Amino acid sequence: MEVPPPLVLKRPLYVPSKTLMGPGPSNCSHRVLEAMSNPVLGHMHPECLQIMDEVKEGIKYIFQTLNDATMCISGAGHSGMEAALCNLIEDGDVVLMGITGVWGHRAGDMARRYGAEVHYVEASFGRALSHEEITFAFEAHRPKVFFIAQGDSSTGIIQQNIRELGELCRKYDCFLIVDTVASLGGTEFLMDEWKVDVAYTGSQKSLGGPAGLTPISFSKRALTRIRKRKTKPKVYYFDILLIGQYWGCYGTPRIYHHTISSTLLYGLREALAHFCAVGLKAVVRRHQECSKRLQLGIEELGLEMFVSREEERLPTVNTIKVPFGVDWKKVAEYAMRKYSVEISGGLGPTVEHVFRIGLMGENATVERVDMVLSILNEAIQSSKLGIKTDLSKI
């Protein structure tokens, strides 16, 4: 039997233009998109290695770190989570997960697969974790590794006390992993000053790059622990000592580890170059100002933010309570069909409870804020009135 070529691949590729105002990815700039149209390079070509070096310096800047072990994992943000846990955890290690949404549970699932004894400290619904709650959990479990998401995109909660958690982890001889996938670029993060041992982020959110590369950095303290492991990390692909050699992190000759996408490197390089040109503080300030404008607009529309305390609201992924009697799916569908604008529903504990509006990268502008507020209001009013719109004709 011969399998014929699929008819769908005989048609030209068509990709519609959409404004991505959900929890990520965000829209790439023309600069980033144009960069990715450059010719492909071999993964060990000197020109590719040079671009990797430039990307590495950009990552150090956005994390505010001087760590040698700074690089990218080839994979989505989950690969950063896997790499952080895979390298730090050995069988029987006690690991504590901070829970403010879905990501602490996801990390716990991963850690258990690496042989860890996993415990959780969980915040009240719609709240960040207090220092007292975390300290109590440290006393109870004495963890070797503590994981926390600085910003949880499922709930729109920001954990503001990372600096204090760095001190707490040093006091208990514990290693601090911080997930900054949804927060970096939209809020302050000082890896070295706050004594964070491992940090990783996503390339496709506030950075405005393509998905598929995950910036990650390990402190000297974390690197020492990894080098003293009794066993090798359980996943070869995530072995940071090997990946770091490929990225030229340790002053040793570069080795082949895997075939990195030069195309994705070009895009991330230009996204980082934009951050450097504008300045990290200015980028953070723009994201925060846009979030405040959105929150004021939500209040004026008679809607309510999901996170009650303003200081605990994540600027990049804003969560709004779904009004009683409104079907969030119909609202999201209306926005997409009529305006090609993405407005997302909840994730994990917030499914059917919230809308999620992302203000990240190219979409963190006053114009985009005003646009999404107008569309959200129109879509909700349409839903409340029970207007049966034939969306296929919009």
Swiss-Prot record:
Lineage, highest ranks first: Eukaryota, Metazoa, Ecdysozoa, Arthropoda, Hexapoda
PROSITE patterns, A to Z: AA_TRANSFER_CLASS_5
PANTHER family named among the record's database cross-references: ALANINE--GLYOXYLATE AMINOTRANSFERASE, AMINOTRANSFERASE CLASS V
Binding residues for substrate: 153, 356
Keyword Transferase belongs to the record: yes
Molecular function terms, GO-annotated: alanine-glyoxylate transaminase activity; L-serine-pyruvate transaminase activity
UniProt-recorded name of the protein: Alanine--glyoxylate aminotransferase
Keywords, comma-separated and alphabetical: Aminotransferase, Peroxisome, Pyridoxal phosphate, Pyruvate, Transferase
Domain of life the protein comes from: Eukaryota
Thermal dependence summary for this entry: Optimum temperature is between 30 and 80 degrees Celsius with alanine and glyoxylate as substrates.
Assigned protein family: Belongs to the class-V pyridoxal-phosphate-dependent aminotransferase family.
Subunit structure, interactors included: Homodimer.
Broadest EC class assigned to this enzyme: transferase
Gene giving rise to this polypeptide: Agxt
One Pfam family cited in the UniProt record for this chain: Aminotran_5
The enzyme's E.C. designation: 2.6.1.44
Catalysed reactions, as listed in the record: glyoxylate + L-alanine = glycine + pyruvate; (2S)-2-aminobutanoate + glyoxylate = 2-oxobutanoate + glycine; glyoxylate + L-phenylalanine = 3-phenylpyruvate + glycine; glyoxylate + L-serine = 3-hydroxypyruvate + glycine
Species the sequence originates in: Drosophila melanogaster
Consequence of gene loss (knockout): RNAi-mediated knockdown causes accumulation of calcium oxalate crystals in Malpighian tubules.
Task performed by this protein: Catalyzes the pyridoxal 5'-phosphate-dependent transamination of alanine with glyoxylate as an amino group acceptor. Can also catalyze, although with much less efficiency, the transamination of amino-butyrate, phenylalanine and serine with glyoxylate or pyruvate as an amino group acceptor. Does not catalyze the transamination of both 3-hydroxykynurenine and L-kynurenine. May play a role in the detoxification of glyoxylate, a toxic plant metabolite from the fly diet.
